[in-house]
Amino acid sequence: MPHSWDYDAVVIGSGPGGEGAAMGLVKQGARVAVIERYHNVGGGCTHWGTIPSKALRHAVSRIIEFNQNPLYSDHSRLLRSSFADILNHADNVINQQTRMRQGFYERNHCEILQGNAHFIDEHTLALECHDGTVETLTAEKFVIACGSRPYHPNDVDFSHPRIYDSDSILSLHHEPRHVIIYGAGVIGCEYASIFRGMDVKVDLINTRDRLLAFLDQEMSDSLSYHFWNSGVVIRHNEEYEKIEGCDDGVIMHLKSGKKLKADCLLYANGRTGNTDSLALENIGLETDSRGQLKVNSMYQTALPHVYAVGDVIGYPSLASAAYDQGRIAAQALVKGEATAHLIEDIPTGIYTIPEISSVGKTEQQLTAMKVPYEVGRAQFKHLARAQIVGMNVGTLKILFHRETKEILGIHCFGERAAEIIHIGQAIMEQKGGGNTIEYFVNTTFNYPTMAEAYRVAALNGLNRLF
């Protein structure tokens, strides 16, 4: 690379996508700077998204587990905790993650610059530092990895102390007895689980006709049933007409004529790319209505020397995928092409209580494609390990081709689902005939384990063949 620039590459954002790109670039010998607008590295994933929400979920699920354990079932021993106490646990995890990720940059001699960046021209950025000074820096190439933020419609007053988004909910200082969650996507469903697990009444407003419609329908139905059974009120096919903040809570008027009142509102309906402050018009780049950029298979934007990864390019909007996208973009940026690519079947983990995880095709997709598939199921309640630890709620479902025995999709509902799914994913990725459901029958599992669900499900499915 020419050395007339301050840097070979500048990465805007230090979340998973920015970290993947920066580490990939420095490992290839590039001079790299990472710009982070906040005081700590890690991006939204570490500070407002994945890490704190999963830490909250874990704490709440352990409380539920304790209170449902027959050994501690008398009411004098019930474990309770305030939202503030649980947030302290999340803060501890965030601090550990921040220190660890800061160490990655320091060990790899990757410069971190703090402040807000915007483009002056195609190779120059202005950096507004926290002390008010403005610096300019130049680079041959750029990676935009500035992430996303919760979508704020203009007619919702997010300055009201009882109206929250998925970022500000982590600053909740009172103890709500009743919460309305608007938006039943992944974030809305995860927080519905968290609040209900703390004995808070939950109204979950879904703008569609079923929860998480991208999931296999059995998984979606399982979550709906579990919510219903735990007391979450789900209202499908509803949209708000007006949201009023009052002294003691929030009133939501729905277009159907209904009215709801609760102590607070969590608005969790969509996200927007953090591109509006980058002055992309100065370099001729345009975003869509949600602030997202279009890229090619190597994550190049319409400007070949400007790349974009992570939430800012939309689907799949997963921290795991963003890191890989950054790594692939770094390879393309230095070498002109990328030999690595995102895997075709990206696993999804949804951290409701219980968890949901999937990889591959759903039953609905295979039916529409007219693929002759069969189903193998294992119920957690039939596994010795689940009985020992009290994880009786859950199921593992394997979809496989009737003739070739190739695994086409795996879907899991239950505690540790996001871990369990990777066993099946590893077999699905095997080439040359290695992807076969018969593997689970012909191998030996530790006993007792949750992994044994694969053997049970495989036998169940193969026994259906004739």
UniProtKB/Swiss-Prot annotation:
Top-rank taxon, per record: Bacteria
Protein family: Belongs to the class-I pyridine nucleotide-disulfide oxidoreductase family.
Catalytic activity: NAD(+) + NADPH = NADH + NADP(+)
GO MF annotation terms: dihydrolipoyl dehydrogenase (NADH) activity; flavin adenine dinucleotide binding; NAD(P)+ transhydrogenase (Si-specific) activity
Annotated GO CC locations: cytosol
Localisation per UniProt entry: Cytoplasm
Name the record gives this protein: Soluble pyridine nucleotide transhydrogenase
CC cofactor note: Binds 1 FAD per subunit.
Role according to the record: Conversion of NADPH, generated by peripheral catabolic pathways, to NADH, which can enter the respiratory chain for energy generation.
HAMAP family in alphabetical order: SthA
Cross-referenced NCBIfam families: PRK05249.1 (NF003585)
NAD listed as a keyword: yes
GO terms for biological process, alphabetical: 2-oxoglutarate metabolic process; NADP metabolic process; pyruvate metabolic process
Keyword Cytoplasm: yes
Subunit structure and binding partners: Homooligomer; probable homooctamer.
Cofactor: FAD
EC annotation from Swiss-Prot or TrEMBL: 1.6.1.1
Positions contributing to FAD binding: 36-45
Species the sequence originates in: Salmonella typhimurium (strain LT2 / SGSC1412 / ATCC 700720)
Keywords tagged on the record: Cytoplasm, FAD, Flavoprotein, NAD, NADP, Oxidoreductase
Top enzyme class: oxidoreductase
Main location: cytoplasm
UniProt feature coiled coil, ranges: none
